[in-house]
Each structure stands twice: as structure tokens, then as C-alpha cells.
């Protein structure tokens, strides 16, 4: 009997990607985050769709429509908080996924890595425009401050900002177009994720050792489908823990105050997952310099394959590089903390030192340490 799974044009694609896919036998739980990101995206699209059914993208009614969702719509509150906290889970998985790629040298798959960096930028853009939609104080002022950064671009900056705003300030036109962007971008993310997977399956997955696993492959199903389901259960457990017990833990209280252009909040800050980049932006006194540093903090990931000087792919057998990697993680946590603090002593100097260290580790120390390790191994 002919197996439809292996012959049907559509089923064949699914089969080759998720069922009969040859996978390395030794990939650890750090390889779970790709599937978790897929689940996060599906969850965000579904909850977002139901929220969009009740949301109105007008400055007069946006805030009250979100209140209406929470108070009057059946299970509206849980949908809203699953969407808001789902974004946080999305970014936790993203950071883990990127960290895994850096640690185990997955960036040597050039196309997969570069599509991944584009995906990271797209997800960040989606989260930013989404944060503006509830039209609270932090939504309004966050949108004003971040879009204003584009005015640092020489010559065309001011015109560009007014073009994005659709006027001379963040107003009705801005909110409407941000809602449109927020609706379309997740589908672009889904398409990019498919391209990401397509390129990954050209080469096959990396593994913790960083060496070829062609000699020892196992089918993706049932081994890794079961493993992914366990990861998904953990993800849903932690998400629901957040949603049901501390839904506002990661949010800003200022966003429960309707947007008011005449009243600036004492501390304007983005959501927690952008704080590291925000701290780097604030650590440079010059506006254009700050914007360049902000963009570079993510764009530097594109350079990772060029900065790889080690003869080994993975950090698994490179203790000095491992130490440096964990210093980088600690540095990013420090930047995240600083991004949420007011601009005053000693936070300014800590932020500046942490920002310098961030670029120093990636651009200078990593390649040097890798070369030293090569010499120690007599390669």
C-alpha cells in the first residue's frame, strides 16, 4: 500500500520537515526553543485575532475598547493577558534561541542565521507597534520617543518622522497605521520562519559538539516530537502561571492611565525585552550616535560568522570562550536592569561601562580568546 504521507504533494512537505526528518541523536533541550517559538507565534496570532475583533484603532476609543475587552467580552481578560504575556514568553524563547546559536556556533549556517536576524528585527518591530495599541501613557510616550529617534538621520530625518506619524505628532493616523502593521507583520514573520526552516533543512541541524552528525541520525518523529511536546507543556505552564497569578508583573502601571500628550510620565521606558537596547541607546549622549549604537546592538549578530576565529565550531570544548559567553549574558542582564532605571548617577556610568563591554566582548575579546585557544590546542 502506498503511504499517502510520503506521496501527497502537501503531506510530503510536512513529512520531510516534521516526521521523517533525519535529526542528530544528541541535540539537547536548547534545541527545543525553535518549536516553542513556532507555538508562541501561533498563540499570538490566535489571541491577537480575537482581540482585533473587539479593538478599535481610534485615539478616542482605543483605551476604552481594551477596557471593554477585559470587562465585558467573554474571557476577554484571559485573551488579553495571554497576548501581552505571550509576547514576553516569545522574547524569552527568542533570547534563549539566539544564545544557543551563539554558544554552539550555529551562525556558521549563514543563510539560516541571517534570516534569523531579520526575524529578530521583525519580531521587535511587531512588539513595538503592538505596545502602542492600548493607548495608555507609556504606549503614547514610548511611540513618541522611539519614532523620534529617526529624526537623528541626517537631512531626511524630520520628514521621515512626520511621514511615519502621518502628521506633526503621534495621533489618530499613527495609531491606525500601527494597528495595520501589527496585524500584517506576524504573517510576514510566519513566512520568514518557513524560509528559516527551509534553509535549516538544507544543511540539517547543528548539535552540541559542533561536528557533523551524518553518521548518527534518528527520525524526528517520535523522538523529538515527544521532546517538543514536553517543552510546549512547560511553556504553557509558565505562561498560564503568569497570566493567572501575576498578569501585570511585566507591564507598566503607567499604561493603565489613558494617553495624555500634555502630561509626560516621570520615566519613559519600553517593555522589559527592549531594555538592554534602550540602555545602550541612553548611554551615548549624542542622538545619532545613540541610534547607531541601538541598531548595532542587534545588527552585530550578522557579523558573528566573520568574527569566528576558532578552529572548533561549538564552545562545548572551549572553557575560556564559555567564561566570556557567560560574562556577555551577565552584561546583558545588567543592561536590562539599567534600562529600567532613571538617568542619574550611578546608573549612567554603569550603563556606559556595560555598553562598552557588550561591544568589546563580541567584536574584540571573543575573536582574541578563540585564537588563544587555537594556540593552546596547538592548531
UniProtKB/Swiss-Prot annotation:
SUPFAM superfamilies cross-referenced by the UniProt entry: a domain/subunit of cytochrome bc1 complex (Ubiquinol-cytochrome c reductase), Transmembrane di-heme cytochromes
Q: Does the keyword Ribosomal protein apply?
A: no
Per the record, membrane topology reads: Multi-pass membrane protein
Mind listing the UniProt keywords for this protein, alphabetically?
Answer: Electron transport, Heme, Iron, Membrane, Metal-binding, Mitochondrion, Mitochondrion inner membrane, Respiratory chain, Transmembrane, Transmembrane helix, Transport, Ubiquinone
- Keyword Transmembrane helix present in the record's keywords: the answer is yes
| Subunit and interaction comment | The cytochrome bc1 complex contains 11 subunits: 3 respiratory subunits (MT-CYB, CYC1 and UQCRFS1), 2 core proteins (UQCRC1 and UQCRC2) and 6 low-molecular weight proteins (UQCRH/QCR6, UQCRB/QCR7, UQCRQ/QCR8, UQCR10/QCR9, UQCR11/QCR10 and a cleavage product of UQCRFS1). This cytochrome bc1 complex then forms a dimer.
User: What name does UniProt use for this protein?
Assistant: Cytochrome b
Taxonomic source organism: Dama mesopotamica (Mesopotamian fallow deer)
